[in-house]
Structure formats: C-alpha cells, structure tokens
Amino acid sequence: MKGNEILALLDEPACEHNHKQKSGCSAPKPGATAGGCAFDGAQITLLPIADVAHLVHGPIGCAGSSWDNRGSASSGPTLNRLGFTTDLNEQDVIMGRGERRLFHAVRHIVTRYHPAAVFIYNTCVPAMEGDDLEAVCQAAQTATGVPVIAIDAAGFYGSKNLGNRLAGDVMVKQVIGQREPAPWPESTLFAPEQRHDIGLIGEFNIAGEFWHIQPLLDELGIRVLGSLSGDGRFAEIQTMHRAQANMLVCSRALINVARALEQRYGTPWFEGSFYGIRATSDALRQLAALLGDDDLRQRTEALIAREEQAAELALQPWREQLRGRKALLYTGGVKSWSVVSALQDLGMTVVATGTRKSTEEDKQRIRELMGEEAVMLEEG
C-alpha cells in the first residue's frame, strides 16, 4: 500500500468536516493503534462475510487479534468462524518463505473447505519483508479457480478506522460489480414496479439484530441485495452495484464505500440506524423516499403506524419501571447516538455518552438528542 493511497482514504469527501478549513481525518497519535491497528480494522470489517475463508498472512498472534469479537451471526455458512493463518516464524522470515507458505495455504484451504473466495490479510511482518501479495493472489486464483483477494492493511499503516476503509476500498474495486443479481422469485407477491433492491453498508448483524428488521423490509417488497458485511455472502456483495439505494449504518467505518458507489453507479445513500423506535421509523421513511415510489411511501407509513402502536403497548410495562432512570453510555461510533435514541424511547435520561470512535457528524447527532451541553466521554 502506497503512502498516497493511504492519504487519499484519510481525506474522505463525504465527511462534512472535510469541507472546513482543516480537511481530512486526523492522523493517528503515538500509541493509538493500541485500540486497534489497520489490520484489526480490516479483518473485523470483513470477517462477518460467512462463506469466505479469511486467511491471515503473518505470525500466529495476529490471527487472534479480532477473530469473532464482533459477534456477528450467520443464517447459513460458518466458514468465517474458522481461523486460518500462515503462522510465519523467524526461519520463514530469514529464508524468505512467506510467499511460498501463503500460496500453499490458499491451495490447502480451497481443496479442503471449498470457500466462495479467499481473503488474504497482510500484517506487519510480511509487509516489512516486501511479500508480493498481489502476485501470490493471482497465482493462487489461477491455480484454484477461486477468487483470491489481497487485503493490504498491515497494522503499522495506521488506525483501526483506516483499516475499515482499506477493506471497504478493496470491496469496491475488486468485488462489487462482478456479478449480476438473481431475478426475484416467481412466488413473490409484489408486482414488478413494487420490487426494490437495496444495499446495507456497515451493518454487522451483531447477535442477529438485523433479523428483527428483515421481516419489515420483506413486507414492503424491499430486497437486500447485499450486506457489507453482516450475514454477508460473497456472491451477494458482488451484486451491490445494482442496488437502487444504500443505507449506511456505521459512518465511521465505511462511508468511503457509500460515497464510491454513488460516484461509480449513481446509487443514492443515507446514514441511518435501526436502534430504537424513532430511528427505525426514520430509516424506513428515508429508504422509501430514496426509492421514489409513492405506493411504497404509503405502505411504509401504514407499516410504521402499526409497528409503533404494537411497540408502545409492549414497552409500556418497562417504561413504568425505567422512566426517569439515568444511564451512562460508553460505546462509541454510531452507537454513541443511536443507543441514546433507543434509551430515550424508554423514558430514560442519558447523562453522558462515549465518543471514542465517533465522527463530528456523530457528535452533532448527540447534541441534537441530548442538547448542546451534552457530556461526551472522549477517552477511557
């Protein structure tokens, strides 16, 4: 990865603060990668893609860096729960055997596990050695007939957030747009003009949380072409260029993907959340608006009215117990404001919220929810 390519990812045009006098994301401070390096960010972003073999090229310690710590659930394959590594040691470094070990590792994985694709994550040691990941990937792909993709995000490149963007950049350039989506099933109850395809970016299906939202989209005739990357499938992500709209769920991680897809394919996008009643209703309304279907807007409003009424009844006993209680959130990123909204729906008062990985846009949302004097915890 060249230095100018890294700087380009840090200078994100879609960030509002990028248009101020001082543009670009802040450079990492010494010790910042203790909270997650670029490799960690790349792996945690793509690991939920369930039918891909995720191979860490480096010492075995790197393989455990962020394996499965997001808790993303899969409705099908579980290949992503297997940890693969080339386990480089001192002798491999001295003798220059890294590339050969990597090639044989890919061939072994494909022969034994039959993945939809193999993602190879670069780490500090082979990056400093100068291993040619692209050449090995091309040779392995030719030998196996399976897509082999290099994720060049060695830890010393920068922060965890940079790793998120590096991983997303690879998906845009090498994966998305490589396949056409399957036709809608003949058994669908929706007329052709009522069918809509969307993409989800930065949605990780933590503990299966998105499965509570999926039935609402199904009822509206909205198909999720691909999710980057919760409960994701490699072939589905390849079709995301055909989405009519994209929803960005975690802006800090993959805002560059939403912006790039808009530039390349003209796909409109918005940032939203499925945490809390108000946020979920707003997200559904924004989706319907972006899709530009008046009939869908009407059906969306009817669904929201029905579901909000049901939620109000279900939450009433809890509101009686929780109303006026104080809560302190120590989360970060998109959850620094989205969970505030959910707790306020229960009548609770949020006295402070963590903003360790939050953007300026996230902080503005916090102020809108908690007031201009909102207490934000930057460090912890």
Predicted regions and their residues:
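An N-terminal assembly and electron-transfer interface module characteristic of large anaerobic redox
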Residues: M1-G380
